[in-house]
Amino acid sequence: MRIVFLINLACYLTSIVALSSILFYYTNLYMQNQRNQPQHSHPNFWSEYGDWYGYNGLVNEIRDKDMEHLNGSVYLDYTGSGLYRTSQIEEIFDLYKKNLFANPHSLSPASSLTTDLVERARDIILQFFNTTSEKYTVIFTASATASLRLLAESFPWSDDSLYLYTRDNHNSVLGIRRWATHWGAKFKTVDTKDLEAEGKEFDGSRAETVNHLFAFPAEENFAGVKYDLNLIKKFQETDFGDRFAEKRGKWYVLLDAAAFVPTHRLDLEEFPADFVVVSFYKLFGFPNLGTLVVKNEIVPHLRKMGFSGGTVVMATCGKDFALLQSRGCSRFEDGTIPFLSIIALNKSFEKLNEIGIDNISKHSWTITRELFLRLNSIRHSNGRPVVKIYGNHYMNDFERQGPIVTMNFLNNKGGYIGYNEVMVNAKNENINIRVGCFCNPGACTRANNLNDDQVEEYYNKKTSCHDSIDIIDGIPLGAVRVSVGAYTTMEDVEKFTAFVKKYFVDT
């Protein structure tokens, strides 16, 4: 009897253990599913955006297992720089460990392997932009800013040229005007409303010897406002640009895509900009590189003012002779290219493509929309808003607003709270955001209703971008920017909104 009892007891205990294991498994599965679903603040969230958020739970898996370097931080500065993944870095350095790479200015085995992977990186970039090497050239640079400087130095300016740019451009785009005026060209800024008129197709009378350049961002980096990419063909194929210039000429278009491409697809077949600048660290955190993508037909017309190793076939010492490389990228990539960083692009694009840029677009829009709705609903006890939000969020249009929520904080009387106070408190909560003007003076000063005279007066009182002066005469000199990206989660949104309520809502 005792043996039978013990056998029955063992079977009973085994059943309990098995049942507990099953219960534990399904409980964890349920909790994971619950976690994958955003805790939405408005009733239609799941029906509107449920299929867009989280890559079917993959975002949480990546955050848990592949981004250990976050260490509990809330990262909300994707427009400043993207985030790399642990596996991305491991695979890149595994590639370095298992292969011998060398200066590509040679035909040695190691150099040949290096060249092959560098060329593969160029092809991957062009494929990402839906074009080929038959139409565009990839010139590697240190950053988007370095790309813009290269273009500024090499563009064929003349006395009759006009450099036209929108107000909401980055400082690095504005800075091109110094090179333009050096060559006798003029510059002019335009507002969005100035670009709404239509142009007429060319009648064949334009002066091909006069080169004009129009620059605008696909998405401006202050508040995330998106521009209409149809402006590219409007300037290229009609006489629209000539209304701004003193002399008719050929218009080229520079597209600053640095803030745009980390969360949006850029199709150069549909929107064939003449020049495109990109920063890869904004796409996927590593490597820290940029590129200038140029139409092949334009490369021969660009000036190469000097030369260096890698850009010439041969030069003489006693007379001014230098035979430049015939290939466009080789002509403008001075010295030895950062080949190890360029090789890393291959693995970095693999990680991005695991998710897909279109899925990243949907996910980041979902996060942005929810963040805006939550922040916009926060009120002081007297009903006054806690934040003033800039941009096109109120349109609720994916095509008009990028993944940025830029704001200024308000007290319960409607006065501004300095952005430095927000930054200090955010640092205390291990929240990564950005404050200031974000190198976009046009968008920043317009948001705060500052004219050029006020800008000159007020900013002459500052000593640096990050000094303590953030409000003068009750007017903010910048703002607070929260930007999201591929790996932002609803948990990040919840933590930031909780932070706002904790520090800035009156009690």
Whereabouts are the PLM-identified features?
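N-terminal signal-anchor transmembrane helix specifying type II single-pass membrane topology
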Residues: 1-30
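Pyridoxal 5′-phosphate
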Residues: 23-507
